Swiss-Prot record:
Keyword line: Coiled coil, DNA-binding, Homeobox, Nucleus, Transcription, Transcription regulation
InterPro entries per UniProt: HD, HD-Zip_III, Homeodomain-like_sf, MEKHLA, START-like_dom_sf, START_lipid-bd_dom
DNA-binding region: 24-87
Stretch list, region Disordered: 1-24, 132-157
Tissue occurrence: Expressed in stems, leaf sheaths and blades and panicles.
Coiled-coil region list: 91-134
Superkingdom, natural source: Eukaryota
Location of the protein in the cell: Nucleus
Transmembrane segments: none
Protein name (record): Homeobox-leucine zipper protein HOX10
Family: Belongs to the HD-ZIP homeobox family. Class III subfamily.
Length: 839
């Protein structure tokens, strides 16, 4: 670049010839390469220098001496503008490439649908002709049956036979991925678009269950194929994938014999395995294809003894078609077509094996989401806190999930064996004496005596319980079901050289849990976080020791928009974050059984305050929004793991059985509370038992606000009590009521208040007033208590408070006032937080 051009800034005299610099102030100024280089160096350090910095630049660089300060200012303005335009242009080009690729996908899908329509029209005409000429049609059908040749069985015992099967598999797979071999229908809730995971369809009326997805990812085809072939890295239900034989094929391809094991989703069904042929090849247009199908016979794979706990399932031609995209990236087509042998499971659980939607959610879209996640991490779009690398955090998620799946399935070849029970078979106790919880690098604190892991697990059917709501409640209100002493026992096994039974050193849980987010997937279907449980010492000596417990926790399907086939809360105690940290996973899994209602309930809020939708609103909610929820069935699986030493095996087993039974009872209580059939005004009145009806409380709150402040809280305060309650419930600012006692406890909150506190009406009474304010907030509140008691209300300045989940919440202003009952006595205190938001 010989010279750079910048517009000279206009001067007060309107321009003219500058005798000092010899430049025309009304025209462009040409900078020499040396001047541009000097300016670029400054721009790299400071894109927007101040006036003093520009003056300093002129003094320090003699080469810029003939340039006026205004010209320097204009140069930096233009340079920033060019930078911004370049970035915007690059962004728009990327969006355009993505839209072009998506348009290509949609055009191909439209072409496929047109072919399908033509085929259906032809079949319709043929059927009409058959109906008109029934005898002739019957004769033709018989002739067709006689003359149609059958495809001969291929010999899978030699390479040539395998290559022949591979070519057939390729043809059948492509006819499903881009053709009309299967009648595909768009999966409900999955709309294509630039920001969607892709175009997702499920089969209609074919053998087995099938799903197809296609989308755009910003990775090269070879990288995409490498990721997708590593099925255990993205398919959480995949226990193991082993390649037994690899045969080279033409065009640089390979034919592999693969044995795959899947975990059982619950303790009530056996696991599945596959013995398949996998063919990888390159097409003439440069596309990469990986297709796979089952080989006939059940004797393939490892020895029969190791496969006793599995049911052999069949994979019909499936796979991945990855095409290079202009401008970079890939267009990916994924097809999963399975026959999961639904006959082998109890009838109530067969929807898990007969639903194409389950396959789409657990396998097909999971694969597409995973490669999108990798693409965003590779491009630097994903940045996590604490300086952790995305791959490291993803590994922690995989290990948590894998440990939980191992506990549920309890495979013999992993060392698990069933222990004798106590006569009641509601909880299964399994023992693993070969499983080690400490790595070799931590051998200094290994068990002093032989031991292992005991797993207590149970499964139960739930009726009318929205899975996402249940898992969110279990996550946010651990004190409702967990025993802090058990958590302390599990955490102590990571630190000490011996395991002591809980109760020998009892601890008290403060009720406070702080959730620290670590990572989440692209669409928030998985969240990895650290949970800190705050312990309270029982003696003065223990006050000097930290009793906090840290858990690494993985949440699946808790997002409001989740439409997944599995909802999980899995956690393990941790002491540190080295890669070799042992993770003893425990937790909950809820799987919907009625797939026709997938996603219908996940949008319900955690609070039970829909009970405040009184009168006709309640009837409408029970008749419409909750109709599907009331009929929703799901299976809940609970699995908890406990390290033990050999001499304490029976004691730990008894403790584990009793603990899981107590958790089952707690979950049943919670399920009754959050069931749509239990909501309504009566449920709300039960929750705030001992207090006036919700409608009466709403009237007292509004009347007291007007009495103390002289203005109305609501725009229409002259309606009946039920109308006031509805308006207060939907009021835009957070309204909270707490008891008028020495230690105020929250007793009521409107919808905004529950959202701000990140809690539910069930657990609201677990929160005290002092827990939501930080130190400045407490000082402001306590200093105004006398004023509040004297004049009945007080304004609090803007500040920060804490939600029940430990998140900071800012607010512009808060108002506190005394709520007076009918007898003019103080019933409670009310707070209104104006313009609150999470920090």
């Amino acid at each position: 670049m010989a010279a750079a051009v910048a517009m000279r800034g206009s001067s007060s005299d309107g321009g003219g010839y500058d005798k000092v610099s010899g430049m025309d102030s009304g025209k462009y100024v040409r900078y020499t390469p040396e001047q541009v280089e000097a300016l670029e160096r400054v721009y790299a350090d400071c894109p927007k220098p101040t006036s003093s910095r520009r003056q300093q630049l002129l003094r320090e660089c003699p080469i810029l001496a003939n340039i006026e300060p205004k010209q320097i200012k204009v140069w930096f303005q233009n340079r920033r503008c060019r930078d911004k335009q370049r970035k915007e242009s690059s962004r728009l080009q990327a969006v355009n490439r993505k839209l072009t690729a998506m348009n290509k996908l949609l055009m191909e899908e439209n072409e496929r649908l047109q072919k399908q329509v033509s085929q259906l029209v032809h079949e319709n005409a043929h059927m009409r002709q058959q109906l008109q000429n029934t005898p002739l049609a019957n004769d033709t059908s018989c002739e067709s049956n006689v003359t149609t040749p059958q495809n001969p069985l291929r010999d899978a015992s030699n390479p040539s036979g395998l290559l022949s099967i591979a070519e057939e598999t390729l043809t059948e797979f492509l006819s499903k991925a881009t053709g009309t071999a299967i009648d595909w229908v768009q999966m409900p809730g999955m709309k294509p678009g630039p920001d969607s995971v892709g175009i997702v369809a499920i089969s209609h009326g074919c053998r087995g269950v099938a799903a197809r997805a296609c989308g755009l990812v910003n990775l090269e085809p070879t990288k995409v194929v490498e990721i997708l072939k590593d099925r255990p890295s993205w398919f959480r239900d995949c226990r193991n994938l082993e390649v037994f034989t690899m045969i080279p094929a033409g065009n640089g391809g390979t034919v592999e014999l693969v044995y795959t094991q899947l975990y059982a989703p619950t303790t009530l069904v056996p696991a599945r395995d596959f013995w398949t042929l996998r063919y990888t090849t390159t097409m003439e247009d440069g596309s990469l294809v990986v297709c796979e199908r089952s080989l006939s016979g059940s004797g393939g794979g490892p020895s029969a003894a190791s496969a006793q706990q599995y049911v052999r399932a069949e994979m019909l031609p499936s796979g991945y078609l990855v095409r290079p995209c202009e401008g970079g990236g890939s267009i990916v087509h994924i097809v999963d077509h399975l026959d999961l042998e639904a006959w082998s499971v109890p009838e109530v659980l067969r929807p898990l094996y007969e639903s194409s939607r389950v396959v789409a959610q657990k396998m097909t879209t999971a694969a597409l989401r995973h490669i999108r996640q990798i693409a965003q991490e590779t491009s630097g779009e994903v940045v996590y806190a604490l300086g952790r690398q995305p791959a490291v955090l993803r590994t922690f998620s995989q290990r948590l999930s894998r440990g939980f799946n191992d506990a549920i399935s309890g495979f013999n070849d992993d060392g698990w064996s069933i222990m004798g029970g106590d006569g009641v078979e509601d909880v299964v106790i399994a023992c693993n004496s070969t499983k080690k919880i400490r790595s070799n690098s931590n051998a200094g604190i290994a068990f002093g005596a032989p031991g292992g892991i005991i797993c207590a697990k149970a499964s139960m059917l739930l009726q009318s319980v929205p899975p996402a709501v249940l898992v969110r409640f279990l996550r946010e209100h651990r004190s409702e079901w967990a025993d802090y002493n058990i958590d302390a026992y599990l955490a102590s096994t990571l630190k000490t050289s011996a395991c002591s039974l809980p109760g020998l050193r009892p601890m008290r849980f403060s009720g406070s849990q702080i959730i620290i987010p670590l990572a989440h997937t692209v669409e928030n279907e998985e969240i990895l976080e650290v949970v800190r449980l705050e312990g309270q010492p029982l003696t003065h000596d223990e006050a000097l020791l930290s009793r906090d417990i840290h858990l690494l926790q993985l949440c699946t399907g808790i997002d409001e928009k989740s439409v997944g086939s599995s909802f999980q809360l899995v956690f393990a105690p941790i002491d540190d974050f080295p890669d070799e940290t042992p993770l003893i996973s425990s937790g909950f899994r809820v799987i919907p059984l009625d797939m026709k209602t997938d996603g219908a309930s996940s949008g319900r809020t955690l609070d039970l305050a829909s009970s405040l939708e009184v009168g006709s609103a309640t009837a409408q909610a029970s008749g419409d929004a909750s109709a599907d929820d009331c009929n929703l069935r799901s299976v809940l699986t609970i699995a908890f793991q406990f390290p033990y030493e050999l001499h304490l095996q029976d004691s730990v087993a008894a403790m584990a059985r009793q603990y899981v039974r107590s958790i089952v009872s707690a979950v049943q209580r919670v399920s009754m509370a959050i069931s749509p059939s239990q909501t309504g005004l009566n449920a709300g009145q039960r929750i705030i038992s001992g207090f006036p009806e919700a409608a009466t409380l709403a009237r007292w709150v509004c009347q007291s606000y007007h009495y103390h402040l002289g203005v109305e809280l609501l725009s229409q305060s002259d309606g009946d009590a039920e109308q006031l309650l509805k308006m207060l419930w939907h009021y835009q600012d957070a309204i909270l009521c707490c008891s008028f006692k020495e230690k105020p406890v929250f007793t009521f909150a409107n919808k905004a208040g529950l959202d701000m506190l990140e809690t539910s009406l069930v657990a609201l009474q677990d929160l005290t007033l002092d827990r939501i304010f930080d130190e400045p907030g407490k000082e402001a509140l306590f200093s105004n208590i006398p004023k509040l008691m004297e004049q009945g209300h007080v304004y609090l300045p803007s500040g920060v408070c804490m939600s029940g989940m430990g998140r900071h919440v800012s607010f512009d202003q808060a108002v506190a006032w005394k709520v007076l009952a009918e007898d003019s006595n103080v019933h409670c205190l009310a707070f209104c937080f104006v313009n609150w938001s999470f920090v």
